[in-house]
Regions:
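Catalytic cores of nucleotide-sugar-dependent glycosyltransferases that transfer UDP/GDP/TDP-activated
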Residues: 1-361
Length: 361
């Protein structure tokens, strides 16, 4: 198949990944290429060139040290630049003669313009409903041309008022990149990811201390005020922050932990950290929010619906007793990126056939 992959433009699609969406776009594009498809990734210019990138936005204002774009005093500058990048692409997308457009942009323009394009589009819903996307989808629904896929059943339920019976394909990870460690060497808890209020890092530290376990925090600071105010004061000899680590080092940190602590403070649509932890054999303790209750089973973790630090502390010690083998088996059966990509290939084939059938007399 000849596939156009539309990335979002907040960050280049390259390592180190700023978040799960960048990782998803990178991995799925790479696998589609490896499977022999003719793939073009439409992304910002500093994205990984091995992904056959067609740059639609300059990264002259992107700081590779802070992994962020320089902010103009004109609050609309980023918005307008992104709007026109997608607008110009969608105006000429049919000229490329793609079989299908795989839309991961989290932007309203491709959805709006897809109603005027001949090339069929599959849009992935990576987040709960946001204003711009809702408005575009409601308008596009009149044309019945779009195919939507949600990354979890929980996320699909939130989109139900706008997209009834949305298809669901769970996100997956490359299990070959995450080594299973059957016998962990540490009794510490681990929290890893972006340090941001949405991720609730300080709750994990407080709960681990209450549980009597040391905790390691691995991740970059995505919100400096939050880090300085809520996280840094809790760091001590029993709460260590590992700011920078390679993929191999992160694998070791996860695999040797007794338990991973995952504390979403919003309705997390999926949470790749869950899959990564289970792939390494490390059970999960966390808040029962967003997609976590649909991903974490009683054999692989312990969740608290109350989101209290006291109950999370109990979950930490309970989860640490669970079978590490069961965690890896669950990752292999339900969270493998190979299964995920195959499911998307099936969707693409259906959409392409449906589009072709319209033109059969």
């Amino acid at each position: 198949m000849k596939i156009a992959v539309l990335a979002h433009l907040k960050h280049p699609i390259r390592k180190p990944f700023m978040g799960g969406l960048e990782a998803f776009t990178y991995e799925v594009t790479k696998l589609l290429l490896q499977r022999g498809h003719e793939v073009t990734l439409f992304a910002s210019e500093h994205s990984d060139p091995s992904l056959n990138v067609h740059a639609i936005l300059s990264d002259v204002d992107y700081d590779m040290e802070t992994l962020s774009r320089f902010r103009s005093h004109e609050l609309s500058e980023d918005f307008i630049s992104t709007h026109h990048a997608y607008l110009e692409l969608m105006q000429e997308i049919d000229q490329y003669d793609f079989d299908v457009i795989f839309n991961n942009s989290l932007n309203y323009v491709p959805i709006t313009m897809a109603t005027l394009a001949e090339t069929p589009m599959v849009t992935v819903l990576h987040t709960p409903p946001i204003f711009e996307m809702k408005k575009a989808i409601m308008a596009a629904n009149r044309y019945n041309k779009m195919t939507y896929v949600s990354v979890s059943q929980t996320n699909a339920s939130m989109w139900e008022p706008y997209i009834p019976n949305c298809k669901v394909i769970h996100n997956g990870i490359d299990l070959n990149k995450w080594s299973y460690i059957a016998n962990n060497s540490g009794e510490y808890a681990l929290w890893f990811g972006r340090i941001h209020p949405d991720k609730g890092t300080h709750f994990a530290i407080a709960a681990a201390k209450l549980a009597g376990r040391p905790i390691k925090i691995a991740g970059s600071v995505a919100d400096k005020h939050y880090f300085e105010t809520f996280v840094k004061p809790l760091l001590d000899e029993n709460a260590e922050w590992v700011e920078h680590c390679t993929h191999e080092q992160l694998n070791e940190l996860i695999g040797n932990a007794a338990v991973s602590v995952i504390t979403p403070c919003w309705e997390e649509p999926f949470g790749l950290v869950v899959a990564e932890s289970l792939a390494c054999g490390t059970p999960v303790a966390g808040f029962a929010r967003g997609a976590l209750p649909k991903i974490v089973t009683k054999e692989t973790g312990c969740l608290t619906a109350s989101c209290s630090v006291t109950e999370l502390a109990n979950c930490i010690n309970d989860a640490a007793q669970l079978s590490r083998k069961a965690c890896r088996v669950h990752a292999e059966s339900s969270l493998d990126i190979q299964h995920m990509v195959s499911s998307y290939e099936n969707i693409f084939a259906q959409v392409i056939k449906k589009c072709a059938d319209k033109y059969v007399l």
